[in-house]
Regions:
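Extracellular calcium-associated, cysteine-rich motifs in secreted modular proteins
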Residues: 132-192
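Secreted, disulfide-rich extracellular signaling modules
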Residues: 2-137, 141, 179, 185-405
């Protein structure tokens, strides 16, 4: 009994002592009685301009073209060199060249199609601003209020959103130009709602400047892999690479004065559809292109290099074609004012338009007496492959003020 009482007393004592609160300042021994002091060190910082002699310019989604003079940086000029790529073994016209050559006794439609180039164009699109935060069909740069789709940019009493949804022009108070404002006009059917207004960006200097635009055949083989590394790594091309200066150019494909056009390009149908008597398709738009550089190229050159090679080994693989037609050099000269462009080179192309003969059997394949031969037309595209910029900077007469910051 005595032992139980002693045990209880000891337990109570431990409980009482454990409830005793005693505060200790954790880490107080780390604080010193003296305040921390620091010193200040001042040193001059020098900034200076350093010219970069060259840099890699291939593998980019854009290309530079033009000439511009910037204060303190001198004059910069940029040209483009590009490889061309095509699909393998293309067929021009309706039948393969082999079938044309061999003929077909059982098919009178198989003839020598006489494919002939009619037009060739080089096209390089501009970049255009498509930002439209409020989704009213008017890009922010032209929108009265880019954050309000009910804003009325053209002031005709209809919101931008309403006009876009009703196939009207939100940037014109009279979409069809008949003298009646859109908010009261009950007939706007003559307005082509597919017409677009573009806001072109990445063009610097005087957009109205004239210059000479020249396109040459490239005579240097642009290899995808670097022969200096035994073709183990991909080739790199730098801003100081100038194959024109080194003499690697052939025929002149275009040489003329040029001025940029920032309007949508529209092309009407070439032929009228006889089945639609009330509509003349030659007066309606067939194709629309965003604003771009678009210049004609030498037709005879592409007749020889492209159409006349149908069925040959030239089109059997990329290397064969690149050795046959190695690419283009695009140069600009003689600017009447500064103009420098960043272009959408990833969508650049050459468009070869051609016509060919086609037999119309008039639905009687077994009777050739009523067969007629007609001219048909098609388009063949050559896209840009590997490309790079040659960039020259002349700052020999430019002085820099080197200052201490």
């Amino acid at each position: 009994m005595f032992i139980n009482r002693v045990t209880i007393l000891l337990a109570l004592s431990l409980i009482l002592f454990s409830c005793d609160k005693e505060y200790h300042a954790a880490g107080s021994e780390l604080l010193l009685s003296t305040a921390l002091k620091s010193k200040t060190f001042e040193a001059p910082v020098y900034s200076y301009q350093s010219k970069v002699n060259y840099f890699q310019t291939d593998g980019l989604p854009l290309a530079q073209l033009g000439k511009i003079n910037l204060s303190g940086l001198g004059t910069t000029e940029a040209n483009i060199t590009a490889k061309l790529v095509v699909s393998q073994n293309p067929v021009f016209g309706r039948f393969t060249q082999k079938k044309e050559d061999e003929g077909d006794d059982d098919n009178s439609a198989v003839i020598d199609e006489k494919e002939t180039v009619t037009q060739v164009y080089l096209e390089i699109p501009f970049f255009n601003n498509t930002d439209d935060k409020d989704g009213d069909g008017v890009i922010d740069a032209l929108d009265l209020d880019p954050n309000d789709r009910d804003s009325d940019t053209d002031g005709d009493g209809l919101s931008d959103f309403a006009e876009t949804n009703n196939n009207l022009n939100p940037l014109s108070e009279d979409s069809d130009g008949d003298g009646i404002l859109d908010d009261v006009d009950q007939d706007n059917k003559t307005y082509d709602n597919e017409n677009k207004i573009y806001e072109i960006d990445s063009i610097y200097g005087n957009r109205n400047a004239r210059f000479d635009l020249k396109v040459y055949e490239l005579k240097y083989f642009l290899s995808k892999y670097d022969p200096a590394t035994e073709f183990q790594t991909q080739s790199k091309f730098f801003s100081n690479t100038d194959f024109f200066e080194k003499g690697f150019y052939g025929e002149t494909l275009h040489d003329d004065s040029y001025q940029l056009n920032f309007e949508e390009l529209r092309f009407n149908h070439k032929e009228d559809d006889p089945d639609t008597e009330d509509v003349d398709e030659r007066e309606t738009v067939e194709t629309r292109l965003t604003p771009r550089i678009r210049v004609p190229l030498d037709k005879a050159f592409f007749q020889e290099k492209i159409l006349d090679q149908e069925g040959s080994s030239v089109f059997s693989n990329d290397d064969n074609f690149s050795r046959h037609l190695r690419g283009l050099i695009i140069k600009t000269e003689n600017f009447d004012d500064d103009l420098y462009m960043l272009l959408d080179i990833s969508n650049a192309r050459i468009k070869v338009e051609y016509e060919y003969d086609e037999v119309d059997t008039n639905g009687t394949a077994d009777n050739t007496d009523d067969d007629t031969t007609e001219k048909k037309s098609k388009t063949f595209l050559l896209n840009f492959g590997l490309n790079f910029n040659t960039i020259r900077n002349n700052n020999s007469n430019t002085t820099f003020d080197q200052e201490v910051i």
